[in-house]
Amino acid sequence: SSHTIKNYEDEKEKVFREILQKKGCEVVDISVGYNTFTTEKYQDAAARAFETCNDMDGILGVDMAAAACMREAQLRGRKVPEDLSIVAIDGTYITKIGPEILTAIVQPIEEMAQKLVSMIISQIEGKKIEEVESIFGVTVQSGETC
């Protein structure tokens, strides 16, 4: 059987944007596109972010984007977290390999993977998958960037 895959990222971004805008914040989206995993793409996006809005005071992005923005901030003389906060989303090892530990919203990736594998095995075995949507809790990794 086939299932329509809903992209919750778009929904989360929409709600995040709405909340910030209600608080009077300007939100600028700098995208690298879906399924982009090269450091060059993230470094290019970080450079574009600083060229587009050099006076920004906060950045939220996946781990690779946050790390690239941290590097770009240092190259441009921006002080983190004094005048620019950077928060990563995912909380993988990438947040811990630079000179500063990135503040991060940590997703339970192992738990998510186990759930997905279990669903795939059930589908292979011909079992009906009752629960196609799962909500996982997140934690905050205190770092040095926010």
Where are these regions (language model features)?
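Hinge/beta->alpha junction and helix N-cap segments in small-molecule ligand-binding domains
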Residues: 1-21, 25-45, 58-67, 89-91, ...
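Flexible loop/turn connectors
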Residues: 47, 51-60, 64-146
